[in-house]
UniProtKB/Swiss-Prot annotation:
GO molecular function, one term: ornithine carbamoyltransferase activity
Species the sequence originates in: Thermotoga petrophila (strain ATCC BAA-488 / DSM 13995 / JCM 10881 / RKU-1)
Segments forming a coiled coil: none
Protein name, entry field: Ornithine carbamoyltransferase
Major place of residence: cytoplasm
Gene3D superfamilies assigned to the protein according to its UniProt record, in alphabetical order: Aspartate/ornithine carbamoyltransferase
Protein function: Reversibly catalyzes the transfer of the carbamoyl group from carbamoyl phosphate (CP) to the N(epsilon) atom of ornithine (ORN) to produce L-citrulline.
């Protein structure tokens, strides 16, 4: 099928079909090869990207800014201290002004409602660089990394360990369901996936001959896993809950024993970063031969560039 995504925003992968995600991954492969050969095509020459950050960032800022600059574009960093973002001026009005002056907007912050309003009122493509609910650009990089390792996505088993209701787990669950993969959320009952998103992903999985499930049982979750994935136990804004989370999530630490429980020496370990080594994952695993976290981090740039190419050109 012919895919045309020009003018689209990326707010959540729930808005994208399997074919559209496949299209983005194919572009990602192409731009990664270009990057390796130092090819610069200046696709975004004369364009401006506004990057709004309510939350700190390493990978997201670097990925968007370098991806846009490599193609000849100009990226502007904006913090809440730099612009009116719902204070003294409505969010709707800020979005309208931005839309008259830039070609695209990236937002990384707290409320999903904020990125949705930016998309509704700006009239230009808006990219979700992370909200409390979703992290779609991370999920695209995850898919790219998995496919690079296994040569396919269909049928790959992915186990997310720990806080399975956080934004990274949620977006990865959506991505796996869309692409025909088998996703297992493994963690305590108190931190199980959001019921509405979980049920929607199960519906999608039935359509793609995949599966989406939750369990607190490590043996059940890990048997035959191709990918073991985890994230920090206390996300940004939840630092006050860290002690409680450590107690709750300690049984779900990814360590050598957990990796061996898959029964597959080719199982890979993934983490969106930043990581608290010795907490959600041991130093031995994240620095070991099964770890793909640095490939995963690099792939943020290539998949983000692909999203911008698909929606701006």
């Amino acid at each position: 099928m012919s895919v045309n995504m020009k003018g689209r925003s990326l707010l959540t992968l729930l808005d994208f079909s399997s074919e559209e995600i496949r299209y983005l991954l194919d572009i990602s492969k192409q731009v990664k090869m270009e990057s390796r050969s130092r090819l610069r095509t200046e696709r975004f020459k004369g364009m401006t990207l506004a990057m709004i950050f309510e939350k700190r960032s390493t990978r997201t800022r670097l990925a968007f800014e370098t991806a846009f600059a490599e193609e000849g574009g100009h990226a502007i960093f904006l913090s809440p201290n730099d612009i009116h973002l719902g204070t003294k001026e409505s969010l709707e009005d800020t979005a309208r002004v931005l839309g008259r002056m830039v070609d695209a907007i990236m937002f990384r912050g707290y409320k999903q409602e904020t990125v949705e309003k930016l998309a509704e009122y700006s009239g230009v493509p808006v990219y979700n660089g992370l909200t409390d609910d979703f992290h779609p650009t991370q999920a695209l990089a995850d898919l790219m990394t998995i496919e690079e390792n296994f040569g396919r996505l269909k049928g790959v088993k992915v186990v997310f360990m720990g806080d399975t209701r956080n934004n990274v787990a949620t977006s990865l669950m959506i991505a796996c369901a869309k692409m025909g993969m088998n996703f297992v959320a493994c963690g305590p009952e108190e931190l199980k996936p959001r019921p509405d998103i979980f049920e929607r992903c199960q519906e999608i999985a039935r359509e793609t001959s995949a599966s989406v499930s939750f369990t607190s049982n490590l043996e059940e979750a890990l048997a035959g896993a191709d990918v073991v994935y985890t994230d920090v136990w206390a996300s940004m804004g939840e630092e006050d809950k860290e002690k409680e989370r450590i107690s709750l999530l300690k049984p779900y630490q990814v360590n050598k024993r957990v990796m061996e429980m898959t029964g597959k020496p080719e199982t890979i370990f993934m983490h969106c970063l930043p990581a608290v080594k010795g907490q959600e994952v041991t130093y031995e695993v994240i620095e070991g031969k099964q770890s793909r976290v640095w490939d995963e981090a690099e792939n943020r740039k290539h998949t983000i560039k692909a999203v911008m190419i698909a929606t701006l050109l």
